[in-house]
């Protein structure tokens, strides 16, 4: 990993609990994320990892607790409001527009950045045309960065799974997030695809300066690229620290590392 400088806390999760009826998905979870770091969340299936991301990006409203991003505390924000604050997310199950091209899928991530009205956008004249050209320039940069130039006009549904994952990452990057939430970005990939995605994640963190919160089942990946790791089990936090510290935590070994998850 590069000699990057980790900044101050920009995302602070405090005492988050989440209930679905009588089922408690998360219980009193607290952790923070520092600027420019890669912060991983691990745990067995059903540990509450995706539920935690859903609370951060406004899909779920926590039953208790609060989340503070750059000094602003929120507990009742929808996904769009969270995105406008500068938090973007990819999902474990791809939600791409399969019939649309790669470039149009990534362009859809620019929606929050569009300032001209719909009428001017449709006419593509004056400021609207210049704005669209600027957005397309940003998107082309992302396409080059992710090494998918050859597929710019290809419908996403025709691409191999690993390339679709890159497009999903590209769409999130098009939002220019300060914090990027990645929900199992390497799920279903072969070794070569995982190595490529690891490289892209590290480069996003290093070159774009984007803070990353990562859920990933591949423990080798987590330990190699993370600055700090928080561990969940049955909706509770059982470990938190640097990778080596977590690797040697007895509770973590029993709950996760010592199992076949």
Annotate each language-model stretch with its function:
Residues 2-261:
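Glycine-rich phosphate-binding loops of nucleotide-dependent enzymes
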